[in-house]
Amino acid sequence: MVRGIIRIASLASVSLSSSGFFLYGTGYWDPSDFGVVRIGRAVLTTAAITWDYFTKLRHVEAGTEEYENIKSQVHLRSAHRLLDLCCFNRGTFIKVGQHLAALEYLVPPEYTKTLSVLHSQAPCTPFTDVVQVIREDLGKEISEVFEEFEKTPLGAASLAQVHRAVLQDGRKVAVKVQHPKVQAQSSRDILIMEVLLHVVKKIFPQFEFMWLIEEAKKNLPLELDFQNEGRNAEKMSSIVSSFSFLRIPRIYWELSTKRVLVMEYMEGGQVNDREYMKRNQIDVNKVSHALGKLYSEMIFVHGFVHCDPHPGNVLVRQNPENCAPEIILLDHGLYQVLTESFRLDYCSLWQALIAADKERIRIYSQRLGAGELYPLFACMLTARSWESVNRGIYENTVSKEEIHEIRSNAATYLPEISQLLASVPRQMLLLLKTNDLLRGIETSLGTHSSSSAFFYMSRCCVRALARHRKEKADSLWSYIHISLSETFCLGQLQMYEIALRLQSCIGRWINHVLLWLYLQ
């Protein structure tokens, strides 16, 4: 057990160190700009965490109250060490820390709570550097562009920070300014990461992490181009314009460059802030349902997916006109465009998962690169045990025992998970990350995927597959037949959902009657 914990802690730290390739340096002297300092800090952190687990737990009997108390204390100390490492090395270390903080169904709470500050409270760039970036990119002083400009940022992330400002005409805006030391270091950092990954492979031969650098090479230039982010925001706004609950800030192109993005200012609370929702009378179930609906549409119908929905990028507020919850989607730098063949196979796989069709789960998992590890792949996609997948994930809710089982088994299957990540299409990697972040939000809200979410997901899959078949139809009769089949399937789903709701209502009514009779 101790070895397993040490292994997990070591891998967490090593993964952070091997992911640390967004380093800062443009001529400003900063100790954290030097690779040897960053690597040394990561190695020391890994060693300290490993030694802490080993020395504190090896002489304590596993499963006892004393063991659990000591383990919790070590978790907390280790989490603070990881937080310090993220803040010192910045860049992707912060990105990885944000991701860990969202994995509340998998990572111990001591880690998620400690690292959650990275969602919006990452280390900030000094205001003088912010002024310099705006001066260089816009060719003007801040006072020439803005009537007001708050020196303290609203939030800071791995690549940039956001300030509230007011334009000369009185419009309130949010100004996203890239950290000045990101661009110049990126190429050298990727090289450093390659070296670190080879070292990791020497230590853990069974693990394959080279997909990390492949994704970095592809995504880093896109995330560093804020004009690309602006285009993504406008495209997403157009694609899901029918969703009245979604708000995406307007981009002010005349004031935006590759390093500066000026957009409409929108207020809201973070999507995982239950206290904020309680104060503002926002229904957490409606928020969770809307978020699931939005991402089902993105993934299955359009194949254009916002892949960084950590809580700092998803805000909620109440519509003052109808009191309905609204979702504000921020940070559109990281998107995954799914190929048609991948998207259709993914649709078919989720239909099989929802229907608990084991044979089709095997077929479509293997088509997506899972091979004989398809049961593990299904568990990773659903965050459910294989037993629950076989029973039907929409028919049985996740229990505390199942969550504990998943957490306990995660370490056991780390080599297989690594093998799986190395074999699936690159498109799948960001989808898995997105799924993890969304489930982390669900866990924070206490709203694990409901049957209604699965019904909407099923409808999206039916629509997507039918649209593809209609595009390939070679006759009018074939087109009509596909359309009728689509309508019939959607009608079946609607009737089944209504039946389940009625069953639920009747069950609650019977419970109330029985309780009333008991109290008489």
From Swiss-Prot:
Pfam families: ABC1. Residues 148-455 form the Protein kinase domain. GO terms for molecular function: ATP binding; protein serine/threonine kinase activity. CDD domains: ADCK1-like (cd13969). The active site is at 308 (proton acceptor). One of its GO terms (biological process) is mitochondrion organization. It is found in: Mitochondrion. The keyword Cell wall biogenesis/degradation does not apply. The keyword Repressor does not apply. One of its GO terms (cellular component) is mitochondrial inner membrane. Its EC number is 2.7.-.-. InterPro entries: ABC1_dom (IPR004147), ADCK1_dom (IPR045307), Kinase-like_dom_sf (IPR011009), Mito_struct-func_regulator (IPR051130), Prot_kinase_dom (IPR000719). It comes from the Eukaryota. ATP binds at residues 154-162, 176. Keywords: ATP-binding, Kinase, Mitochondrion, Nucleotide-binding, Serine/threonine-protein kinase, Transferase, Transit peptide. Belongs to the protein kinase superfamily. ADCK protein kinase family. Appears to be essential for maintaining mitochondrial cristae formation and mitochondrial function by acting via YME1L1 in a kinase-independent manner to regulate essential mitochondrial structural proteins OPA1 and IMMT. The action of this enzyme is not yet clear. It is not known if it has protein kinase activity and what type of substrate it would phosphorylate (Ser, Thr or Tyr). This is AarF domain-containing protein kinase 1.
